[in-house]
Amino acid sequence: EIRQVAADFGRAVDTAYEAGFDCVEVHAGHGYLISQFLSPYTNRRRDEYGGSLPNRMRFLRMCLDEVMETAARRNMAVLVKHNMEDGFKGGIEIPESLEIARAIETYGVDGIVLSSGFVSKAPMAVMRGIIPLYTMSYYMQWWLRIFVRLFGRYMIKQYPFEECFFLENAKKFRAELKLPLVYVGGLVSREGIERALDSGFELVQMARALVNDPAFVDKLREGDRSTRSACDHRNYCIARMYSLDMQCCKHCPDLPRKIREELAKLP
């Protein structure tokens, strides 16, 4: 089954190519499948896929071998999203993460996207900001909704938002790696983007700022260093992901009353 899943990663590249894409990003972070093999917190296997770091990296290498072979045939670029740290004790920390990143560099990928966090253990470490628990539970299935409303505040650690919140850790990887690196994390202004680029990162990624305003990149191009996103990081858009219809709260005038009340109370 493991070999089949790795082969499926290669087939996914074909699907992306046929859909018209020029680049794929292999998600090896945030506690998803590849990340679960890499992290000592989730990987308790006692075979060739668990234990030592080289063993825990084996599945990643298998997936990338398939992806790189197909991408080369399709003339597509390949990025890897990589956790600098999982965000909790017992998970991947920076020294081990640097070892993984150095190995990824030798695989011939076109760049690494540096992130952090673990969706099942430290979800807000990924994005930072406020946790609208009622809103989040509103879009979940009924059984999960009850659980989140009762226990969410005790289980989900909060991480205050600050601009460029991953930058200092990301610089440690920039100092050790030669391949192109993509910075992501808390980019909401032209000044912040310039700070990341001036720190040696070839590219940047944004998400919530573009959910708030799809034309934000054009405004950055036309504006000055003070140009800034109107996103206030109340994370309604993140909570709404469970509905498979991500939208910014500022563009939803018909929000249910309790959601409006919760968002209004958030600082």
Where is each model-derived feature located?
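Flavin-dependent oxidoreductase catalytic cores
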Residues: 1-267
